[in-house]
């Protein structure tokens, strides 16, 4: 008798089946990668929001220690040609002593002055590392970046600081002043905790600069704020009463015209 053995024939993937699997994996990757990227974007927006809460709280604590309840406001130098007649004077310029004043109220990390959704912190810290051979890790380092690398007498922070501050010297002018500048609203930005506008006018907002719609208050094109996929999605603003608002792109409005007569505006 001849014995026969039944063998199970194992069948592998055909070429067509393999191509179908690869195509399905490609589709899944195409769906998952944008979702993961958007998740990272939202996480960074949350980090920015938390940073603004800490900055607003530090400003409130500073005002609590001030005899007149004044919010952080340090003079800007007037000997710079950039400040003549408010030309090239912007709300992201602050007096350098403000950095140390806010440090004593909890803002001890230099990256707190930079938006986590933009590259300015990475660029500036890389420049500092190349110059001094060490990371930019302290507020003193941040001040050194402005004075020794940028050769500046004031700080260029990665946000707009709206608390009015005096210009140095005998002048009584302050910046920003809603009564002297082309602004959308006539109400002043708060300078003290008892001002009526502490819950309606922000003391800080995301850096955003662009052109305005001629028929309205929204922007047509802009840079800054929180962008994803090549489009601005939202921007944060923080208030002296402690709350932070995240404005969608469709709800943003211009607040300050940078140079009179030009289509260049700051939005939040």
Residue ranges: model-predicted function:
Residues 8-9, 51:
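Acidic/polar helix N-cap motif
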Residues 1-8:
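N-terminal secretory signal peptides that target proteins for export/translocation
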């Amino acid at each position: 008798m001849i014995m026969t053995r039944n063998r199970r024939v194992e069948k592998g993937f055909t070429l067509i089946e393999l191509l179908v699997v690869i195509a399905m994996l490609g589709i899944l990757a195409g769906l998952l990668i944008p979702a993961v990227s958007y998740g990272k974007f939202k996480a960074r927006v949350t980090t920015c929001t938390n940073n603004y809460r800490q900055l607003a709280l530090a400003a409130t604590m500073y005002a609590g220690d001030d005899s007149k309840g004044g919010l952080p406001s340090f003079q800007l130098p007037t000997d710079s040609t950039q400040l003549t007649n408010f030309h090239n004077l912007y709300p992201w310029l602050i007096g350098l002593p403000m950095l140390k004043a806010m440090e004593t109220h909890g803002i001890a990390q230099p990256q707190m002055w930079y938006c986590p959704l933009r590259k300015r912190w990475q660029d500036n810290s890389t420049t500092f590392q190349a110059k001094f051979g060490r990371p930019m890790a302290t507020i003193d380092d941040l001040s050194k970046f402005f004075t020794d690398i940028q050769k500046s007498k004031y700080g260029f922070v990665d946000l707009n600081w709206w608390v009015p501050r005096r210009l140095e010297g005998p002048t009584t002018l302050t910046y920003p002043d809603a009564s002297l500048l082309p602004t959308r609203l006539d109400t002043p930005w708060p300078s003290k905790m008892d001002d009526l506008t502490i819950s309606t006018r922000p003391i800080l907002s995301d850096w955003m600069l662009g052109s305005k719609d001629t028929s309205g208050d929204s922007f047509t094109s802009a840079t800054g704020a929180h962008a994803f996929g090549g489009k601005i999605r939202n921007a944060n603003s923080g208030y002296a009463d402690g709350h932070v608002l995240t404005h969608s792109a469709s709800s943003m409005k211009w607040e300050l015209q940078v140079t009179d007569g030009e289509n260049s505006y700051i939005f939040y």
